[in-house]
Amino acid sequence: MILTDIDRLTKQNANPRSIKMWKALQPLRSCLSFMNTGAHPDDETTTMLAALGLRDGIRLSQACANRGEGGQNAIGSEITLDLGVIRTCEMERAAEVINMSHYWLSETPEDTIFDFGFSKSGSETLEKWGEQRTLERFVLIIRRERPDIVCPTFLDISGQHGHHQAMTRSAFKAVLLAADPAAFSEQNLPIWQVKKVYLPAWSGAGDAYDDDAPPPPETVCVNSTGADPILGIDYAQIAQYSRSFHRTQGMGKWIEPGLPSVWPLNLAWSCDGIETHEKSIYDHLPKTLFELSEYAKCAELDTTLCKAQTALNQAISAWPDYTSIHKYLITALQNIAVAITNCPDASSAEILHRLSDKQRQISNALAIAKNINCRVTLSQYEARPGESLELTTDLNTPDCNVTAHVKLPDRWTVEKSENNTHKISIPSDEEPSDPYPDTWYPDRANAPLNVVLEWYEGDHLVSISIDPEERLHVLPTFSAALSQTDAVLNLANPVNIKVSLTQIYPKDSNCEFSSMQGWEISQNDNHFKLQPSTGLTEGMYTFNLLLDKNPTKSINRMNYSHIGTANRCVSSGVNVQVVNVVLPQGRIAYIGGGNDRTDFWLRKLGVDVESLTSEMVQNTELSEYDSILIGVFAFKTCPTLNSRLKDLHDWVLAGGNLVTLYHRPWDNWDPEATALAYLKIGKPSLRWRVTDESADVLHLEPNNQLLNTPNKITKSDWDNWDKERGLYFAERWDETYTPILEISDTNESPLRGALL
């Protein structure tokens, strides 16, 4: 997505210099750091964090286990790993709003720390993630970030998501290990002593979870009530704007200003022994540079650090006088430089990283105070190994002599040409861009290719780093787009599998698929037929695409206005699932809302199904169909469906066959009115789902026609289930309904509301 002039103007006007200046000054209030931990993107306690960071100046960070690959997509069709790519970008945008660094425990799409689906057990989760792997990543993140306070979002108790339990349990272990020189010494990072661990003193129960135990007692609270004095926006509202970037999860809601927002916490652990008599989470910690020398037992730096903090406070008070802000920031910078030079080794572990943070924060603020503007653009935002592109810096520095340097990924080269333009060359063996970066910072460049600006303030060299205005995506050496990558061949209705190739790179490559026994492959230019031979058996068949005999990748592109462009490169090929299924008779309609592709897969089987849009639903004559299939969440996501509810009921009573896929209680589902007879969907959902994908499925009514017509459902049909057995089961229903299946997780009561 290349930014247009209108995009740039909109972005500029949404963030004027005076507001950027105010926001850049806030981190100068404090030298403390606070790390929130969770399992998935959107687990952050955003309202509390917004107040801590934007009001109190606390350095914020989040350690998150995985990318939320197992969740649902409220805005598109991407699932699993592609959804993880989108949610990674969403999390970065959400973190940017509240000036929060973000760390992922999972490093790659293949990482064991994966959102494998809902879990009811922290132990099960850690078994799948690998506890040692989880702790290794957690410890590394703590040692890199050096938080004073760690605060998990959820409690490690039964009734919570197993991923949440696992992260909270691991947080306590990781805090201890991060301070242990013998633990993960191969990381080559200094140990770090977290000072406090807080737990939420509120219940995590709700529509999804059902905590079995009450929360721990409140020992202190964070009051997030109120508004930023310059922005005039409540911290809770800023938080909701941040959460609105979790768009695949439908996050973000309007909150009226002035509402109270108080977050009770429990001091669960401290490095000096638990002290529950606190007035603030900042008690016994160096909130500002005023307290740092005493805390670090470094009296010789007391005067210097106090001068620095005094100057920082004066800079904040001087807003929006840029000249005065600049003067005070230089004074602070000078004193911080003296403190770094004179800091004794015995105190350096508690002091130097805080002063390094202050130098970076001051540098960012100085750039705004001096009105240094730099826009970094690329001649193209997709490139191949071996190619070159141009990077241009549009630098406007009216009162300052600024030098721009291009920072390159390893083995890339740069040649300076005219007019602030640089020729960037990519190695011929470069790998595709990483869709799963494991770290994002709000106060520096994050892209491997970026620009560093340097200038002098007196004798002090100051620098900031800037990303290009859009991401650069390095694409594969060999790639192609396939008309289909997953297919179904029904032996009861066999057809040739047709695959066409487009976007072939290099364009003149020779294209072929790997051969498979039982199949014949014919080719006409870039069009292929996969023809099954007589005697082909059921199973999965994979045909890999080769270009000039080389393994090839396909590019899964994603483009949404709230995140920009993203992509993930995957091995190119076609997976064909061969089955033997008797097809139903009659006219079938599908009414969806964009959350499933059931109609797509029915057509792959050979079923003649007509997909009805919301507009078509409004006017369709239902009597024309023998069966109607209502898709996942469709009563919420298909705007016109509820207006035809009575017609649907009448159609069923007249003999129509209605199949409704799963819905949540909040999907415009009225237990008294949506179904033909009373049907209540269970909540919290944790109690009405079976997470074990291999759980035994008991056929309560083995002779029921649903299990026998037109195909007999046997035990083997429940094999190789993905993610979980099922969720959003019915809790109660009218006696008119007959439960067909019984399923349960280990040591839990059986559930009969999966299929009625």
Where are the predicted features?
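The feature marks non-catalytic terminal segments
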Residues: I2-N13, K20, L177-N373
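Active-site rim/loop-helix segments in enzyme catalytic domains that contact anionic ligands
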Residues: I2-R144, Q165, F172-L176, D180
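A short helix->loop->beta-strand "cap" motif at the edges of active sites that frequently abuts
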Residues: G57-I58, W192-K195, A654-N657
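Short acidic, glycine-rich surface-loop motifs adjacent to enzyme active sites
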Residues: E145-I157
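Long beta-sheet-rich domains in secretory-pathway and surface-associated proteins
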Residues: R375-Q577
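Aromatic-Pro/Gly-enriched surface loop or interdomain linker
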Residues: S554-G631
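A glycine-rich, often tryptophan-bearing local segment used as a flexible ligand/cofactor-contacting loop or short
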Residues: F633-W718
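Catalytic beta-strand/loop cores that center a nucleophilic Ser/Cys/Thr
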Residues: W688-L756
